């Protein structure tokens, strides 16, 4: 078994990568959390029913997992790697860190 690692990215790195078209943000929080407050861009693949195959084709982008605080995103990355996908990045600090960095979120679905 390969020794899977998950690389931490800062909110600033992820925001810039998304703006540059290099990163696809995959939010693994639950639908009720996403409805209350969401990242400004990205796709939602809840960890509770996580299937690495359900992640959309990133079309050349690098997948970055994100959650509330940075724990579930690590779990999702390790699960994706175990399924043979090269998705080894996550947003350290989650949406809490994202907001602390002054980055935009959207509310109300």
Where are these regions (language model features)?
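Rhodanese-like catalytic fold shared by cysteine-dependent sulfurtransferases
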Residues: 1-24, 31-62, 71-109
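Short, surface-exposed ligand- or partner-binding patches at beta-edge/loop junctions that are enriched
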Residues: 66
């Amino acid at each position: 078994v390969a020794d899977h690692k998950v690389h931490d990215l800062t909110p600033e790195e992820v925001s810039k990568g998304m703006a540059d078209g290099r990163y696809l943000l995959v939010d693994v929080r639950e639908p009720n959390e996403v409805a209350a407050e969401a990242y400004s861009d990205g796709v939602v693949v809840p960890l509770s029913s996580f299937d690495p195959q359900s992640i959309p084709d990133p079309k050349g982008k690098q997948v970055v997992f994100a959650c509330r605080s940075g724990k579930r995103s690590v779990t999702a990355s390790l699960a994706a790697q175990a399924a043979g996908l090269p998705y080894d990045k996550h947003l350290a600090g989650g949406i809490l860190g994202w907001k602390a960095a002054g980055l935009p979120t959207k509310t109300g679905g």
